[in-house]
A protein has these predicted regions:
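P-loop NTPase motor domains
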Residues: 47-63, 258-262, 271, 354-355, ...
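Short glycine/proline-enriched loop/turn "hinge" motifs that connect secondary-structure elements
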Residues: 23-29, 102-107, 316-321, 413-415, ...
Length: 799
C-alpha cells in the first residue's frame, strides 16, 4: 500500500547553512554563538547565591543588541552507570564496588546556551512562517558591522557570567557543534534525542495527533502565556524535603522541571529581545485605545489597568521589556510510560504554581525552533511580554554533582541519583588553593555511620599507596586489617591490641640502621618526660635539657658499642649507673630542685625490669613499622589507664613521625579516633601543635575522629591545634544535636549554608538503597553532602 503522507528530506528543510569559526549561520542570515554552561551543583547554593546568579544573567542579557534571542537549553537524559573494571591494579573490593552500581540509572544533565542575532522581521514571525513550513529557503547575506558588534556583545556576555564565580560559560568549537568522524555533534544528538555516542539519525514524523522521532514519541508542555504563570516568581524556592525549622535548603525556582523531573526531557528557555522603547510605545497606544473603548466593555477598562501597571513598572524601575517562552519537551518509546511522563511534567509545573498546558498543535514548530542555532525561527505567538528579571527566574540554575579531575580520590555517591562519583578531598583542593593542608576533622554521633565512612575512606587510600596508621578504640578496623594481612601473606596489616596475656609492647630505642635524627631524639625525650611527670607538673628547662643530654649520650653509647641491646632497661641502667655519677662529678653542680634524677629513676622504676609495666618499652620483637603500610593500634582496653594510655599514644605518634620524616614522596595518613583525648595533656601540647602544622609539608595528613562535641570545647589545645589546622571537615548526621547546633557551628566556624547542608543529612534517603549520608566541607568555600554506599562484599569486611 502506498504511503499517502507528505514526505520531504531533512536536507530540504534544514534551516542551518554552515558553522564557521564556532558560529552557526542559518539560511536566513541569523548568526548564533553556542556555549556549554557549567552550573553549580545541586543542593549547594544559598538564596543569596541564587540572587547573585540571577543578577549576572540579567546584567549579561542587557549587553546584547536589539533583536537577539537568548536560548538556554537544558538536556536531561536517562543513562546507566558503566562500571570501571578495565584497570589492572583494581582490588577485589574496588571491583565489587563497581559491580554493585552496574547499570544503575541516573539522569545526566548538560546545559547549553545559544545567543542568536536576527532581524526585526524574523523576531516577529509566526509559526506559519517557520522554515519547517516554507517550500524553499532563500539564503540571505550577513551584515559585517552588525555581526562584529554582536560578537563583541557575546564576548562581554561570556565575561560577565564567568566573573560571577558561580556559573561558567565555555564556547563550543565547530567540531563540538557539527561533530567529527569519531564523535557526534550537538546538532546530530538533537535530531536523534539520544545520549552522546549512541547517535543514529531517525525519521521524523509529524502528525495531527503526535510527533515522533524514530521510536520516540514526544510530548510538549509550554509556558507561553502570562496567564499560565504563577502570581509571583522568585530566584529560588525552599525545598521542603531537605529543610528543617532551623535550616533552609534552597533550589532554583524552575528546579521541579530540571533534575527533579526524572525522565528524558529538554527544558527550553527563551528570552527574545525586541526594541524595548518601541514595545512600550505600542503599549502606550494600546492603553489609550482601551481607555477610549472602556465605556463599551469592562474588560477593556481592566486591560487598560494591566497595561498601565506594566508601563509604570517599566518606567519607574528602568526595566527592559522582552518576550519569553518556556517549554518542557519529554519523550519515551513506550506509550504507557509517556502517559506517566505527561502526568509527571504536569504535576511538576503545577508545583511551581504554573498552569500545565499540554501543547499538541505547535509541537513540530517548537521542536524545530529548538534546533541549536535556529532560535530565530521561534513562533512569535508562543511568547508573552515580561521583563528580563522575571524571565530569568524561570531558568534552571543547578546541575549534577561533578567528578574531581584528579587521578587520586575516593568513590562516593550522588545523593539524588545514586551514581558513583570520583572525589578528591586531599590533593586537588590544595592545588586549587581551596585548602592549605590535607588534615581532616570527622564529627559524628554514635550510630551515624562514622566507622562505616572511615573504613570506606581508609581502604581506598591504602589501595592507592598510602601508609596508614590508625589509633582505634572500638575494633572498627579489625576486619579491614585482617583482610589486608591475609592478602599480603602477613607482610602488611599489623594489628596491635592489649590483653593481659599479650600486652602491647614497644621499643622506642630500636632502629634498623641505628640512625637517630633530631626528631627521633626529641620524641624519646618527650616520652620520658611523660613517664616522669604528671599532667599538672611543670617541666623546667633544666629538666628538659638534662634529659635530652642523657638521651643523646645513651644513643652515642649504643652506636659505638653494638653489644648493648637498645631498650628502656639498658637506658635506665645507663641513667642509674653512669649518668648519675657524671652529674655528681661536674664542676657546676646541678641542684636537686633543678633536676632530681633520683626522683626520676624512682618514678620510672615501674617500666624497668621487674616493674609493673616492664613489658611496655622493652619489646624483643623489634617490628620495623617504617615499611608496614597498614598499622592499627587498638587501645580500647587501656584508654582509661592513666599510666599506659599517654605512653602508648606517644609511641604511636613517634612511629608516625618517623614515617613522616623518612618516607619521601609517599602519602602518609594518621587516623586517631577517641584516643586523641590523651594528646591534650600539657606535656603533649607542643608536640601536637608541631605535628598538625608540619605534617602537610611531608605529604601527610592527620585525621581526628570524634563523636562528642563537648570534648573538643573542653580542650583549648585540641580546639586550637586540631580544628584550626584541619581544612577538611567531615560531619555525619547531627540531627540529635539540632537544638544545640549553634554551638557546633560557632566552634567549627560553619556558615549558614554549611549548617543547612549538614542538617539535611539523611532527611530524604531513598528507601530502596542502603546508604548513609555525609557532609564534606573544604576550606570553608566548597561543601556538599554525599552518600556512602558500598557493595555487600565491603559490608562483610567490617567486624
Amino acid at each position: 500500500m502506498r504511503n499517502t503522507s507528505k514526505m520531504t528530506t531533512l536536507e530540504n528543510k534544514f534551516p542551518l547553512l554552515a558553522v564557521e569559526h564556532g558560529c552557526i549561520i542559518s539560511k536566513d542570515a541569523d548568526i548564533t554563538v553556542a556555549f556549554e554552561v557549567e552550573l553549580p551543583e545541586l543542593y549547594t547554593v544559598t538564596g543569596a547565591e541564587y540572587e547573585a546568579i540571577h543578577g549576572c544573567w540579567c546584567k549579561a542579557i542587557k549587553v546584547l543588541p536589539y533583536f537577539c534571542v537568548v536560548h538556554k537549553q537544558d538536556w536531561f537524559i536517562k543513562e546507566k552507570y558503566m562500571p570501571e573494571l578495565q584497570k589492572d591494579d583494581m582490588s577485589f573490593l574496588s571491583r565489587s564496588f563497581e559491580r554493585h552500581f552496574n547499570e544503575r540509572p541516573y539522569l545526566k544533565h548538560s546545559c547549553y546556551l545559544y545567543l542568536t542575532k536576527t532581524t526585526k522581521e524574523r523576531n516577529r514571525m509566526q509559526s506559519n512562517f517557520s522554515t519547517l513550513c516554507r517550500g524553499h529557503i532563500i539564503p540571505k547575506e550577513l551584515d559585517r558591522e552588525t555581526t562584529t558588534k554582536f560578537l563583541e556583545a557575546c564576548e562581554q556576555f561570556e565575561r560577565i557570567m564567568n566573573d560571577s564565580g558561580l556559573v561558567r560559560l565555555r564556547r563550543l568549537s565547530t567540531d563540538e557543534i557539527v561533530g567529527t568522524e569519531g564523535k557526534t555533534g550537538l546538532i546530530e544528538r538533537y535530531f536523534s534525542l539520544m545520549p552522546e555516542g549512541d547517535t543514529t539519525l531517525q525519521d521524523i514524523e509529524l502528525s495531527a495527533r503526535e510527533m515522533r522521532i524514530g521510536d520516540n514519541r514526544l510530548c510538549l508542555h509550554t509556558l507561553s502565556d502570562a496567564e499560565d504563570l504563577p502570581g509571583k516568581v522568585a530566584t529560588d524556592t525552599r525545598y521542603e524535603k531537605l529543610s528543617t525549622d532551623r535550616s533552609d535548603c534552597r533550589l532554583s525556582f524552575a528546579s521541579p522541571v530540571g533534575l527533579l523531573l526524572s525522565c528524558n526531557h529538554i527544558y527550553n528557555q527563551y528570552v527574545l529581545i525586541d526594541n524595548s522603547e518601541e514595545t512600550l510605545q505600542k503599549f502606550e497606544k494600546s492603553a489609550r485605545n482601551m481607555q477610549s473603548l472602556s465605556r463599551y466593555s469592562r474588560s477593556n477598562s481592566i486591560n487598560r489597568e494591566w497595561i498601565d501597571q506594566y508601563l509604570n513598572e517599566a518606567h519607574s524601575y528602568g526595566l527592559t521589556s522582552v518576550r519569553a517562552h518556556f517549554n518542557v519537551m519529554a519523550w519515551s518509546d513506550d506509550a504507557e510510560e509517556l502517559k506517566h511522563i505527561k502526568n509527571d511534567v504536569g504535576s511538576q509545573l503545577a508545583s511551581m504554581e504554573c498552569v500545565p498546558r499540554h501543547n499538541t498543535i505547535d509541537c513540530p514548530t517548537l521542536y524545530w525552533a529548538a534546533i541549536p542555532g535556529n532560535a530565530a525561527d521561534f513562533p512569535a505567538e508562543e511568547s508573552f511580554h515580561t521583563f528580563i528579571e522575571q524571565a530569568v527566574c524561570l531558568f534552571t540554575e543547578e546541575t549534577n554533582y561533578r567528578n574531581s579531575l584528579s587521578p587520586f580520590g575516593i568513590k562516593m555517591v550522588d545523593r539524588l541519583t545514586g551514581k558513583p562519583l570520583h572525589l578528591d578531598i586531599s590533593d586537588l583542593p590544595m592545588k586549587r588553593g581551596i585548602t592549605t593542608n590535607r588534615n581532616k576533622f570527622v564529627l559524628g554521633p554514635s550510630g551515624s555511620g562514622k566507622s562505616f565512612f572511615m573504613n570506606h575512606l581508609v581502604r581506598q587510600y591504602y589501595e592507592q599507596g598510602a601508609h596508614v596508621v590508625l589509633v582505634d578504640t572500638g575494633n572498627s578496623y579489625q576486619g579491614l586489617c585482617g583482610m589486608i594481612r591475609r592478602k599480603t601473606g602477613g607482610a602488611d596489616g599489623v594489628y596491635f591490641t592489649y590483653t593481659e596475656d599479650k600486652p602491647i609492647s614497644f621499643n622506642p630505642f630500636y632502629t634498623d640502621d641505628y640512625i637517630f635524627d633530631v626528631e627521633k631524639k626529641d620524641s624519646i625525650k618527650t616520652l620520658l618526660l611523660t613517664l616522669w611527670k604528671s599532667e599538672d607538673d611543670k617541666v623546667t628547662k633544666t629538666e628538659s635539657g638534662e634529659l635530652g643530654s642523657a638521651v643523646s649520650a645513651y644513643i652515642e653509647r649504643i652506636q659505638s658499642d653494638r653489644s648493648i641491646v637498645p631498650s628502656f632497661n639498658t637506658f635506665y641502667e645507663y641513667m642509674r649507673d653512669d649518668y648519675r655519677k657524671e652529674l655528681a662529678q661536674r664542676d657546676i653542680k646541678v641542684e636537686k630542685s633543678d633536676f632530681n634524677i633520683d626522683n626520676m629513676l624512682t618514678t620510672m622504676r615501674q617500666y624497668y625490669r621487674g616493674g609493673r609495666y616492664d613489658f611496655l618499652l622493652n619489646s624483643t620483637e623489634n617490628i620495623d613499622l617504617l615499611g608496614k603500610r597498614f598499622i592499627v593500634f587498638e587501645i580500647d582496653s587501656i584508654k582509661e589507664n592513666r599510666e599506659l594510655f599517654p605512653v602508648v599514644t606517644i609511641i604511636i605518634m613517634e612511629a608516625f613521625i618517623n614515617k613522616m620524616r623518612r618516607l619521601k614522596g609517599v602519602r602518609k595518613q594518621l587516623i586517631v579516633e577517641e584516643a586523641w583525648k590523651a594528646l591534650s595533656s600539657a606535656n603533649m601540647a607542643e608536640y601536637l601543635r608541631y605535628m598538625y602544622k608540619t605534617v602537610r609539608k611531608y605529604y601527610g595528613e592527620a585525621i581526628v575522629v570524634t563523636q562528642e562535641v563537648d570534648d573538643i570545647i573542653s580542650s583549648p589545645v585540641v580546639k586550637e591545634s586540631i580544628i584550626n589546622n584541619s581544612d577538611c571537615k567531615i560531619l555525619l548526621d547531627q540531627r540529635k544535636y539540632m537544638n544545640k547546633f549553634d554551638q557546633i557551628q560557632a566552634l567549627l566556624g560553619l556558615t549558614e549554608k554549611e549548617k543547612s547542608q549538614i542538617l539535611s543529612i539523611n532527611m530524604a534517603n531513598n528507601p530502596s538503597r542502603l546508604y548513609k549520608e555525609v557532609w564534606i566541607g573544604l576550606g570553608g568555600t566548597q561543601s556538599a553532602v554525599y552518600a556512602t554506599e558500598v557493595s555487600a562484599e565491603e559490608y562483610l569486611v567490617r567486624p
